[in-house]
Amino acid sequence: MQNHVISLASAAERRAHIAATFGSRGIPFQFFDALMPSERLERAMAELVPGLSAHPYLSGVEKACFMSHAVLWEQALDEGVPYIAVFEDDVLLGEGAEQFLAEDTWLQERFDPDSAFVVRLETMFMHVLTSPSGVADYGGRAFPLLESEHCGTAGYIISRKAMRFFLDRFAVLPPERLHPVDLMMFGNPDDREGMPVCQLNPALCAQELHYAKFHDQNSALGSLIEHDRRLNRKQQWRDSPANTFKHRLIRALTKIGREREKRRQRREQLIGKIIVPFQ
């Protein structure tokens, strides 16, 4: 298995974390130098995802994260490999990860390398909907189909045909239809146009930040992307037509009723959903 870890060349602490995490399991890996806002990023966007450059709300860091995945896929396609495993440099690995990442016989026995597929290895500890896939369990983990949004791109396996699908799709989408790369891959299933995503359960990996949050612990590595997303949500609200005195007054007067309705909707949305565990 080719394991690629997206990481800034200057991120010494995170690279040391990855070297220890993968090295202690005997899992081979190679770093892929992540992009940052730069001329290199602008060239990559112009070549692969032209609509991204003009996106009004995604920050430079979010665009760089998006393009780091896209450029890595393009590199893998140029090399002619049938599939790759992709990780981000704040990932934690679960028990027996070497059974999945130090070999790939299990993958070849369960998936056609010439088909389009994604195996999501990560959990974000959010409620998700899955359905049976018919893929046989391996190493005490199942491969159900992901039927709802599940954020994050800290760990996944993607086939050559799936890489080509996403790159071709990203190349023609206008700015308003582009979102952070994790939502493009693992957001609304209808947006994937039939691209199957299997959600490993229990998950093989998790982002250190979200693992810490889920267990009420302090994060050792943090997340620049999370910070940028919070700022962008605030900016979108400030720029929204709904952010006028009249609309703010109406929202204040109807807040209790809206909160009650939101709670009802959340209860309905959680029916049948699970939190994918990490172990």
UniProtKB/Swiss-Prot annotation:
The EC number(s) this enzyme carries: 2.-.-.-
Top-level EC class as recorded in UniProt: transferase
Record Pfam families: Glyco_transf_25
Disulfide-bonded cysteines: none
Pathway: Glycan metabolism; lacto-N-neotetraose biosynthesis; Bacterial outer membrane biogenesis; lipooligosaccharide biosynthesis
Domain of life: Bacteria
GO terms for MF: glycosyltransferase activity
An example Gene Ontology biological process: lipopolysaccharide biosynthetic process
Keywords: Glycosyltransferase, Lipopolysaccharide biosynthesis, Transferase
Function: Adds the second galactose to the lacto-N-tetraose chain in lipooligosaccharide (LOS).
Protein family: Belongs to the glycosyltransferase 25 family.
Protein name from the UniProt record: Lacto-N-neotetraose biosynthesis glycosyltransferase LgtB
Gene: lgtB
